[in-house]
Amino acid sequence: MSNLRLRLLSLVSILYCIAALRCRPDQTETIKRFKNEFAFSSICRNDTNFFSGVVCDNTTGAVTVLELPGGCLRGTLRPNSSLFELSHLRYLNLSFNNFDSSPLSSAFGQLNNLEVLLLSSNGFTGQVPSSIRNLTKLTQLNLPHNKLTGDLPSLVQNLTKLLALDLSYNQFSGTIPSSFFTMPFLSYLDLSENHLTGSFEISNSSSKLENLNLGNNHFETEIIDPVLRLVNLRYLSLSFLNTSHPIDLSIFSPLQSLTHLDLHGNSLTLTSVYSDIDFPKNMEILLLSGCNISEFPRFLKSLKKLWYLDLSSNRIKGNVPDWIWSLPLLVSLDLSNNSFTGFNGSLDHVLANSSVQVLDIALNSFKGSFPNPPVSIINLSAWNNSFTGDIPLSVCNRTSLDVLDLSYNNFTGSIPPCMGNFTIVNLRKNKLEGNIPDEFYSGALTQTLDVGYNQLTGELPRSLLNCSFIRFLSVDHNRINDSFPLWLKALPNLKVLTLRSNSFHGPMSPPDDQSSLAFPKLQILEISHNRFTGSLPTNYFANWSVKSLKMYDEERLYMGDYSSDRFVYEDTLDLQYKGLYMEQGKVLTFYSAIDFSGNKLEGEIPESIGLLKTLIALNLSNNSFTGHIPMSFANVTELESLDLSGNKLSGEIPQELGRLSYLAYIDVSDNQLTGKIPQGTQIIGQPKSSFEGNSGLCGLPLEESCLREDAPSTQEPEEEEEEILEWRAAAIGYGPGVLFGLAIGHVVALYKPGWFIKNNGQNRLRGIRHP
């Protein structure tokens, strides 16, 4: 692949080098007309940003390069688009724009000077037009991640200069044309993630193919034999072939240039796995995940150039052999989701001298003490095992260690004092004791600290204020005795704070009782089942970021998503949602929740709750709140789950709650509410238990009928109505994101949180990432 990359990079460099800064007026006008055909994201509305991807020839002034930033264009790409008037284009990249399920236009065939055409992730539908054959100068054609259908086109018939062809992640069907393997210069071919079937023929070994990906198709017959004739292959992916016969690993011995082999999701013959077979000695990356292997493969011992090995999701049991740590170049090793119980060799030295930097041994049955980790370790995941004893202090000497996940084990003793050295620390669900070390140094890089479900005592360490990058802090289900950590609002990036089931106590409002809580970025605050007391000021929620969250405020889709090389980590947390308390993973970045339940809070629910426009879940149950349910709840338009049960609330339920279209769960039981239950569709569908324990309530879903069915709501006096209007006016002034919040509600309504139980392991996306 390196030669191919160099050639393509050289082409782009040449195109830019021969370009002038100025284009002919008619070309500039054509580009502007093309721009005006689409809706734009804010980053692309500026002409300077848009034209930064336009390059013109220094002699003719014609546009030769058009490379638009991903996500700028949104709309239909029509056959008469101004784009197709740019007949001198040599390089066109429109990837990652949204063309709204447009068909791939035959007008692309008019751009017959194109050498590079990149149309990845555009939403194109239908078949590839035959006019693509007119682009005889193409060296690279990328059409992946679209919705293209039909048989694989014979478009390559005239494209004799192609170096790279990527048709992956589409809906192509039928067989692979043999002409794909006779192209004189084709070095890269990716047909993965389609619906291809049947077999294909390769007449000779003259093909220049070095990179071939046929994974995740529906081949029903043998396709490996013809592939073995491609003797120049360096990269080969045959994952999830769905063939009826197991694969014999020894058949790959003719491919001596092979450095990368992906067979995950296939069945392998037992003899080839457990024998000293002849295997390509230049192998660097070998992916055998989910291959039904039950013993550690012996042939791996001879692969001295191997640097990435994936044996995850197999049935391997017993001890990890000590020779695996002696492979001189091994950097990434994934043994997760097997049945390993231990390690051969001394725990002090067996791993310590290894070159491994990324190690995943999660979801196994390891027991006993934890071995000293490799000296160069960067990412270490050992969650969901049965390790016991102390966490080895040697982790503090691993200066490269970035991610440490030892959660769901049986570790005892204290937390090592070096947690501020790491980006991710997850020690959840162990038996750790003592205080959380107060040794987070200035400039600590910690982003996630999860020590929930242990036996920790003392106070929250004030040195956490040095962790300016921290996003996720969870100390739930411990024995921490402290006041409400209002001082944490000085952390500029804190998004999730979980204090559930400890001995936190005292008031939650600031000392002057006037200021708002004002965490700058907090989205999830879970402080239930503590001993908090006092009341909340009216403006308590006035300055929270939850009021204006947008769906794509960040690049990450999931909260706490951390990726490094081949390692993926996502934060998980326990939340009560729609009446269920479960562990939640894959939390979308715009998800927001507040849980104050099970405390001793009193007074009225602050009217400022109505400012939290994008709040999705709110639980204030089992406190001593009094007064009316604020009518400002009607402004929390994204609310899906509301629990106010077990308080002393009085008056009527605001009829406006019946118009909250996403409210799928409401519980106001065991209060002192009166009057008619709102009759919105969402509320009528609730069980009657959600309204029981209020002697004055009537109407569906309760059996008590109301005497005056048409009586309007009169719970709020005129002065309070004026106050609510003031809150609504304040909400308008609190940010332009309010209207956009209504739009993302449609996505929120479809979003189902990733509920799962930890022991189910396979749903938790942690471990070494497939290339």
Curated annotation (Swiss-Prot):
LRR repeat spans: 86-110, 112-135, 136-159, 160-183, 185-206, 207-230, 232-254, 255-281, 283-303, 304-327, 329-350, 353-377, 378-397, 398-419, 420-443, 445-467, 469-491, 492-516, 519-543, 588-612, 613-636, 637-660, 662-685
Keywords: Cell membrane, Glycoprotein, Leucine-rich repeat, Membrane, Receptor, Repeat, Signal, Transmembrane, Transmembrane helix
Family (UniProt): Belongs to the RLP family.
Residue spans, topological domain Extracellular: 21-729
The protein's name in its UniProt record: Receptor like protein 22
Signal peptide: 1-20
Gene designation per UniProt: RLP22
Cytoplasmic side: 751-771
